Amino acid sequence: TNIGAEIIKKNIVTKIIPNSNTDGSDGYTVTFKNSFSFLPTKKHHVKSRGIVFSGGVLGTVRLLLNMKEKHLLKLSNKTGEDIRTNNESLIYVVSKDSSKDFSKGVAIGSIFPSDENSHIEPVRYGAGSNFWKLMGVPLTFGSNIFVRIGKLLFDFVRHPISWLRIYFTKKFSERSIILLFMQHLDSTVKFKKGLFNLTSHISTGIAPSAFIPEAKELAENASKIINGKPFVLCTEALTGIPTTAHILGGAVIGKTAKTGVIDENHKVFGYENMYVCDGSAVSANPGVNPSLTITAMTEMAMSKFPHKGT
């Protein structure tokens, strides 16, 4: 049933400008273009009575920071601040036993608290989800990239048959368990608009790290249980930059524009009919997968909207 919503796929919003009233009370003009073309493409424009940002932290915060400079000047100075992760570590444990099949069942079915601040969730991917092995290398810790590269090469030389079996198996996802390690420990990052993209800076706490000793120990123990090898993304092992699926904040809730970007109903301070309803609004580190938190917060925000016709 068509209820009035139209999804315009493969496009990206590049500009949002209030109409005649600078607070957006009479609506906005939204500019968008094809996001899959490397050549200059025609820009399109639509007018709307209101705006709901729901592009995830990287999409929403990037657009807000771009607009804050020229078109949405009333946005809070807190835009791009209070960004958090779950202090996350993603480690694959790949069994050397070709008869193993961990791909059947729900994606995440249990959670294990390893200490008062940490827990781990075993994750499974469906059969055929093998792309990640092209980006993986042995789990390696080290103080700098040269030490880590040396350890990687040593591991390949020491266990060549094991790694050849892992890289050339057609059943990588079936033989893999992904250990999703997360912590409640709090630290914040600030995003700023750079020359070509967003740049990040530490605001409070310790910088997120790809090298968490507790996660390494758990992965090594799991490897012994399933006769496997721990396996991480090459970006983590080589650059030391952590990977997270749960980035939060950047347009957080506050009492005023001095403490947040949106109010308790997700309305953007300084503008009418403008809301943020995604992970950008989350103001703390829940330490677990935030999907249901984001869903609940969005449902609450939508419940405050007047029903059509009232």
Regions found by a protein language model. Give the residues of each.
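Short helix/loop capping segments that flank catalytic or ligand/cofactor-binding pockets
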Residues: 40-41, 61-63, 101-102, 190-191, ...
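FAD cofactor-binding and catalytic pocket of flavoenzymes
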Residues: 48-50, 76-197, 202-204, 247, ...
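Short alpha-helical segments and helix-capping/turn motifs at coil-helix boundaries
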Residues: 11, 90, 162-167, 259-261, ...
